[in-house]
Amino acid sequence: MRVPQHYKKPGWQRFFAGMMCGAVISWFFFLFTYGTFQEEQVSLIEKQKEHVKDLNNQISIYQEDLHKLNEDNKRKLLIQSVSVKLLNGDKYKISQPDKTKFEEHVKDDISEVITKDIESVYQTKDLLKRTIENKVYMINEKKYEATVRELIIYTRLTVELEISFAT
């Protein structure tokens, strides 16, 4: 069996030539559109990379600023209130109103630390302790001395005291 000779029939020759030309034209069209889309994608990726780089720079700048502000705020924190707690008032059978009166008296003695910054109060904490401990307090006509058991310095100054009879 023999393959028919297509070169003798001009209709078939035109058909195959048209197929070849169409294939070449469609291949060039495909390359053009694919290249165009790839250029757009590459430019979009480059823009996004630049945008991400800018955003990362902004984030690092904001983080640095935030860190600096936090450091400044830590330095500038102020004592806003004072709380005093008497730990062993029950041992000496001191009534609740007398405990409250004693705590208020100690608060009045150390109230000058309110609105001072925490750092300066921390530096003078020994003076603050001695101020409380060196004073003799009168409760129900009995003399008591206070001993500072705990001194917590933050925006609230917390003092925990124990008392004993004054000698």
From Swiss-Prot:
Its main location: membrane. The keyword Ubl conjugation does not apply. Keywords: Cell membrane, Membrane, Transmembrane, Transmembrane helix. GO terms for cellular component: plasma membrane. It is found in: Cell membrane. It is a single-pass membrane protein. Induction: Expression requires the sigma-E factor SigE. InterPro entries: YtrI (IPR048198). The chain crosses the membrane at residues 15-35. Involved in sporulation. This is Sporulation membrane protein YtrI.
